[in-house]
């Protein structure tokens, strides 16, 4: 059975991608920071081989925790994302740093952390 790791899996594109793969027999490692939406996603997918991770990937420690918890996927969908709902020029340095890590640094850390395993498998895709 093929395995997909999907970040941002509790809504939007990530949720729809997870739904499509689940319907086509894939097992899923689903990551979301929103507990309520994670619960809804958990109830939406069938299969005993699915895993759910309630993690905020804007935090470096949580990316490391995820890397230590998942097996090598056949497919990585690095989809997690948020936006800042402030007017231009009103976001704090903390908000920008968190957003930057989630959308850029964390994605790089996740991919770099998986690369050795992905190379060994030779059939994995990002």
Predicted feature locations:
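Conserved glycine-rich Rossmann-like NAD(P)H-binding loop of the short-chain dehydrogenase/reductase
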Residues: 24-40
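Active-site loop of short-chain dehydrogenase/reductase
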Residues: 2, 73, 118-126
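Conserved glycine-rich cofactor-binding loop
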Residues: 10-11
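Conserved NAD(P)H cofactor-binding loop of Rossmann-fold oxidoreductase domains
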Residues: 80-85
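Substrate-binding pocket helix/loop in short-chain dehydrogenase/reductase
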Residues: 87-100
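A short, exposed helix-loop element centered on a Lys and neighboring polar residues
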Residues: 111-112
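Rossmann-fold cofactor-recognition segment
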Residues: 45-59
């Amino acid at each position: 059975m093929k395995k997909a790791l999907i970040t941002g899996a509790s809504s939007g594109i990530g949720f729809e991608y997870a739904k499509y793969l689940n319907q086509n027999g894939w097992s899923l490692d689903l990551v979301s920071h929103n507990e309520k939406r994670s619960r809804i996603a958990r109830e939406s997918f069938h299969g005993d081989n699915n895993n759910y991770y309630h993690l905020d990937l804007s935090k470096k420690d949580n990316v490391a925790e995820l890397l230590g918890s998942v097996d090598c996927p056949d497919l990585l969908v690095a989809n997690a994302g948020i936006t800042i709902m402030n007017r231009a020029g009103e976001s704090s340095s903390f908000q920008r740093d968190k957003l930057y890590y989630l959308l850029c640094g964390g994605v790089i850390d996740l991919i770099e952390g998986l690369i050795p395993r992905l190379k060994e498998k030779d059939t994995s895709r990002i």
